[in-house]
């Protein structure tokens, strides 16, 4: 989570890393107020937060170096005094081209065409309008982590198949 507002970090943590106390609170609230659809997750997400793009880049570079890359980054568009969201995304992708990104913004001061022109067409970018709904964050995190995981598995299988083809080709040449 890359956002200059610490309360946004807490919001993401409450959604993606609910502790047992908050689950009990949700159940009590549901019983009391009749809310039959509280957000629940069995997924285990590792959530790290940065208040500026440069700090996020350092986290991503370290994760890649340690071979524990991030699957998804939720990135705010406005983070004064540092990089804006687009510069942050460009630098994050330079460090890890497989990273899935969700732009989180309350403002529409940058038209989609400008965003697309700057970073190109990609299936690795989604937009989440603030204020966001908990289920939207949870669904985005779940789906994008799954997409990222499947892409890694496919890349591994393609590599294995390529190696197998190379080996068979060498055998046939002999």
What do the PLM-derived regions correspond to, one by one?
Residues 1-5, 52:
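Acidic di-acidic motifs
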Residues 172-174:
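Conserved signal-transmission helix
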Residues 5-19, 25-29, 59-61, 68-170:
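N-terminal membrane insertion elements
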Residues 22-72:
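Acidic, metal-coordinating helix/loop segments flanking the phosphotransfer/catalytic sites
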């Amino acid at each position: 989570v890359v956002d200059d507002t610490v309360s946004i970090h807490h919001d993401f943590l409450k959604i993606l890393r609910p502790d047992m106390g908050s689950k009990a609170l949700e159940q009590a609230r549901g019983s009391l107020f009749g809310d039959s659809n509280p957000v629940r997750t069995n997924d285990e997400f590792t959530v790290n937060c940065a208040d500026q793009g440069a700090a996020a880049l350092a986290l991503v570079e370290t994760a890649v170096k340690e071979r524990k890359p991030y699957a998804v980054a939720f990135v705010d568009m406005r983070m004064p005094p540092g990089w804006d969201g687009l510069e942050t995304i460009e630098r994050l992708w330079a460090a890890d081209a497989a990273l899935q990104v969700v732009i989180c913004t309350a403002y529409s001061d940058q038209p989609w065409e400008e965003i697309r022109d700057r970073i190109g067409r990609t299936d690795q970018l989604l937009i989440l309008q603030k204020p966001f709904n908990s289920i939207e964050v949870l669904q985005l995190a779940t789906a994008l982590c799954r997409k990222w995981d499947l892409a890694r598995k496919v890349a591994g299988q393609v590599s294995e198949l390529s190696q197998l083809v190379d080996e068979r080709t060498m055998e046939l040449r002999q």
